[in-house]
Swiss-Prot record:
Record localization: Cell inner membrane
Name under which the protein is recorded: Leukotoxin translocation ATP-binding protein LktB
Database matches in InterPro entries: AAA+_ATPase, ABC1_TM_dom, ABC1_TM_sf, ABC_transporter-like_ATP-bd, ABC_transporter-like_CS, ATPase_T1SS_HlyB, P-loop_NTPase, Peptidase_C39
Gene: lktB
Keyword Manganese applies: no
């Protein structure tokens, strides 16, 4: 009833969905109690105040249909009749609008006429205040600006060194001019000796300063690289579980590897070339003093370089995008193949997998070749412009020398100066592929860094939990357009109670425990522990006090001791051994040559399935959690391993609230209470013998199937 009542207030439904989109939890009943004073639904003012209370920045605007593509989406289309809906995307090419019908609880695609018929011109734009103050600041090239400001002293030193290098670059052509016009004409050997010594000193200083600049610059960019790498890994581990469930492992790995491209760009010659290019204006002034005509030729070539880059860049970027996509596909396929190597060998499907790999690899190589060809064409175009300018300057310069407007020394000095000007331009043009590549890398890495993390700030860190659990009116789905997984679930679990949860696959058993661990926030209702709403709790505080054992547990490539004591590497050995004994793992660990120091291999490959599972149980017990979840923890074990664990189950459950999820009913028959789920709802609950008395019940049916 409460879910249906909330559905009648579409403003509250919209606020709930937009809050979830911005990774902000809320209690709809609490919002309704505070802001829906007359019980008729949230008014416009009440809606804006409710959004503000959730740290959302909401703004009511009036916008013409033709300008909707300019606003930040999703946004709430406010209707005076209460039939609000969400505007998710505007397709300007096809004049279509992706909306979400809050009343029907389903997405819709509307034509221009259909949208205009229901649009009243009112829109509520919603953004997270965290993004406004920079907590969710977008990762792009502007991210590096604070880093540059932070290390401004080092970059200032680099700038000063660059100024001296440019001064030395000016002196060298002047020396050559003096030698050509004065020394050779007047046979001044003493002057030649002085100039030679001075030139040698300048060259030595230039080499030393150039090396010093490269060192200082590389040192500072390495610091930025370390900061970015650390930020990336912290952010990756802070992302919600839904981020990883919606993406292939290979895609995520490929995006993280783009950090290498950014690193190469930061530590390469591209940025120093940019500095050199900035000082080119000084050279232009000196070159203009020598010959305005020749300088105009050089200046006239610069638009040619720019136009050529503008022509090549979009094509190159598209090809780089395609290259990355194919590289990510290869990465994902490789990770998938290595992970599933046992299945591949068992089914003898290596030829099929190899054939798929060969096709994908050929596609990637072809894409990479197209990038190389286009980059080569771009570089040769730059060379063509450079050679053409050189020929024009040679012809025009020779005419100026013959006519007496320019000396031979001045012509040589001018050509040397023009080389100093053009060199960074050419380097930048040749490095344009790197610029495009790093742009792609920043965008791909932004997919990780721009994804909102789980919110920890402002969350409650409560005292040690006791173990009372309450699910109230829970309604949940994994995506807005996905089917409902849990519907109106109400469940009270008392402290110290052992609860078994059974049901068909897909009935929502594991989803309940994911909500309990706050991996997800329910669309409606509350999950409470000791009366505290988990939507307001710090996820780390919560998860440290819950022990979880899954069907397929992952062990890290470390020693058994390190795996058990993963949450507290410095814990006493006595606690590790006690947890191992409780899990029935101590005996087989003691028989290993290295005992608790045995390296288990990647994902525990050096151990049997039963051994891995018992270590996982020990890992879950070592912190003495007040809530323990066994999610199909024994379903894949042999009977001996399961028997060992079940023998210790009474000790394991002592003083804890335990939730046992199982398909094998023998695992839960001794539970204090058994919950039977079907299609996201609780259909039966009671003790084993009580449920068997209902011969028409689902539990009795499942029990009969297992007996047969």
């Amino acid at each position: 009833m409460e879910a249906n009542h909330q559905r009648n207030d579409l403003g509250l439904v919209a606020l709930t969905m937009l809050a979830q989109y911005h990774n902000i939890s809320l209690n709809p009943e609490e919002i309704k109690h505070k802001f829906d004073l007359d019980g008729k639904g949230l008014s416009l003012t009440a809606w804006l105040l409710a959004a503000k209370s959730l740290a959302l920045k909401a703004k009511h605007i009036k916008k013409e249909v033709s300008r909707l593509h300019l606003v930040n989406l999703p946004a709430l289309v406010w209707q005076d009749n209460g039939k609000h809906f969400l505007l998710v995307k505007v397709d300007t090419d096809n004049n279509r609008y992706l909306t979400y019908d809050l009343e029907k609880d389903a997405p819709q695609i509307l034509s221009q006429d259909e949208f205009e018929a229901c649009y009243q011109g009112q829109l509520i734009l919603v953004t997270s205040r965290a993004s406004v103050v920079g907590q969710l600041a977008k990762f792009d090239f502007t991210w590096f600006i604070p880093a540059v400001i932070k290390y401004r002293k080092i970059f200032l030193e680099t700038l000063i060194v660059s100024i001296f290098l440019q001064i030395f670059a000016l002196i060298t052509p002047l020396f050559f001019q003096v030698v050509m016009d004065k020394v050779l004409v007047h046979r001044g050997f003493s002057t030649l000796n002085i100039i030679t010594v001075a030139l040698a000193i300048v060259i030595i200083f230039e080499i030393v300063l150039s090396g010093l600049r490269t060192y200082v610059f590389s040192h500072s960019t390495s610091r930025i690289d370390v900061e970015l790498g650390a930020k990336l890994f912290r952010h990756l581990l802070s992302l919600p579980i839904s981020y990883f469930e919606n993406r292939r492992v290979g895609d995520t790995v490929a995006r993280v590897r783009e950090l290498d491209q950014i690193r190469n760009f930061l530590t390469g010659q591209a940025l120093t070339s940019v500095l050199d290019l900035l000082f080119s204006f000084i050279f232009f002034a000196v070159m203009w003093y020598y010959s305005p005509k020749l300088t105009l030729v050089i200046l006239g070539s610069l638009p040619c370089y720019i136009l050529w880059s503008i022509f090549i860049s979009p094509i190159l970027r598209r090809r780089l995008d395609d290259k990355f996509a194919r590289s990510a596909d290869n990465q994902a396929f490789l990770v998938e193949s290595v992970t599933a190597i046992n299945m591949i060998k068992a089914m003898a499907v290596a030829p099929q997998m190899t054939d798929t790999w060969d096709k994908q690899l050929a596609s990637y190589v072809s894409s990479s070749f197209r990038v190389t060809v286009l980059a080569t064409i771009g570089q040769q175009g730059v060379q063509l412009i450079q050679k053409t300018v050189m020929v024009i300057n040679l012809w025009l310069g020779a005419h100026l020398v013959i006519s007496g407007d320019l000396s031979i020394g001045q012509l040589i000095a001018f050509n040397m100066l023009s080389g100093q000007v053009i060199a960074p331009v050419i380097r930048l043009a040749q490095l344009w592929q790197d610029f495009q590549q790093v742009g792609i890398s920043v965008t791909r890495l932004g997919d990780v860094l721009n994804s909102p993390t789980e919110q920890y700030q402002g969350k409650l860190s409560l005292p040690e939990i006791k173990g009372d659990i309450s699910f109230k009116n829970i309604r949940f789905r994994y995506k807005p357009d996905a089917p409902t997984i849990l519907n109106n679930v109400n469940l009270e679990i008392r402290q110290g109670e052992v609860i078994g949860i059974v049901g068909r696959s897909g009935s929502g058993k594991s989803t309940l425990t994911k909500l309990l661990q706050r991996f997800y926030i329910p669309e409606n209702g509350q999950v409470l522990i000791d009366g505290h709403d988990l939507a307001l709790a710090d996820p780390n505080w919560l998860r440290r006090q819950i022990g979880v054992v899954l069907q397929d547990n992952v062990l890290l490539n470390r020693s058994i001791r390190e795996n058990i004591a993963l949450s507290d590497p410095g814990m006493p050995m006595e606690r590790v051994i006690y947890a191992a004994k409780l899990a029935g793992a101590h005996d087989f660990i003691s028989e290993l040559r290295e005992g608790y120091n045995t390296i288990v291999g990647e994902q525990g490959a050096g151990l049997s399935g039963g051994q891995r599972q018992r270590i996982a149980i020990a890992r879950a017990l070592v912190n003495n959690p007040k809530i323990l979840i066994f999610d199909e923890a024994t379903s894949a074990l042999d009977y001996e391993s399961e028997h060992i664990i079940m023998q210790n189950m009474q000790k394991i459950c002592q003083g804890r609230t335990v939730i046992l999820i199982a398909h094998r009913l023998s695992t839960v028959k001794n539970a204090d209470r058994i919950i039977v789920m079907e299609k996201g709802e609780i259909v039966e609950q009671g003790k084993h013998h009580e449920l068997l008395q209902n011969s028409n019940g689902l539990y009795s049916y499942l029990h009969q199937l297992q007996l047969n």
